[in-house]
Amino acid sequence: MTTGKEYVASVFEKVKAQNAHEPEFLQAVEEVFESLIPVFDNYPKYIEENLLERLVEPERIVSFRVPWVDDKGQVQVNRGFRVQFSSAIGPYKGGLRFHPSVNQSIIKFLGFEQIFKNSLTGQPIGGGKGGSNFDPKGKSDN
């Protein structure tokens, strides 16, 4: 019988191999996985049902361009992301982040954590997150 620690380690190795270029996402996954070891020790049925494999893979990731016109009339283009992680308990819910550092790894990390935040509300909502590397600082409303 597989222990919780063995299961978590095995799944995390697969996640690392598939997401090696996403350090923020991997850090969040590792922290959550470590905290779940006692759960898998107490409920081995979750291991049999591959709960972590289903939880850690987003249902959908959308990458898109965000064109906008600056105050000089020049078209600028930024990148946007929407990660929809889990609709198991309801429709996706999660905010938007606008910051120059935003990338797919950051949005995946935030969307992954949103699953757990939303589940604690008692509302039937799933987890997702969106954002863009657009920096709103110093931009006009024009």
For each predicted feature, which ranges?
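N-terminal ligand-binding/catalytic initiation module
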Residues: M1-N142
